[in-house]
Amino acid sequence: MPQLATICYIDNGKELLMLHRNKKPNDVHEGKWIGVGGKLERGETPQECAAREILEETGLKAKPVLKGVITFPEFTPDLDWYTYVFKVTEFEGDLIDCNEGTLEWVPYDEVLSKPTWEGDHTFVEWLLEDKPFFSAKFVYDGDKLLDTQVDFYE
């Protein structure tokens, strides 16, 4: 069964806005630092979902730009996650408290030292290096990354 979702990394030119997932009980992302995002709602485009999730979780009005798509086979029981990856450099507003965790601006050189999903290191580097649009697959067994495949499109 497929689950469609977005993940968004907001970039202020020297830092990424990261979400430390430390507030939701029974959270598959508990304790990890990730971008903001969430599941697509019925009738919603990935772009609309990304903008809505950014506003709901951060209070920022943003213009997300699609940078890639990642497939996570059986990331949660019986669900393959298809995640649209966005980068944001145009945004306005003030941060709000997020009910899913703590928001923090993290300098580029500290992003990869935060506890995160192993595969996130890979695609966050692609975002920071401004790699071309990508289609990737990250295969996990629990927290362990087993396999990565990627195609870049010029």
UniProtKB/Swiss-Prot annotation:
The species this protein was found in: Streptococcus pneumoniae serotype 4 (strain ATCC BAA-334 / TIGR4)
Keywords: DNA damage, DNA repair, DNA replication, Hydrolase, Magnesium, Metal-binding, Mutator protein
Highest taxon listed in the record's lineage: Bacteria
This protein's GO CC annotations: cytoplasm
Binding site residues for Mg(2+): 38, 53, 56-57
Catalytic activity: 8-oxo-dGTP + H2O = 8-oxo-dGMP + diphosphate + H(+)
Coiled-coil ranges from the UniProt annotation: none
EC number(s) recorded for this UniProt protein: 3.6.1.55
A GO MF label: 8-oxo-7,8-dihydroguanosine triphosphate pyrophosphatase activity
Name the UniProt record assigns to this protein: 8-oxo-dGTP diphosphatase
Matches recorded under Pfam families: NUDIX (PF00293)
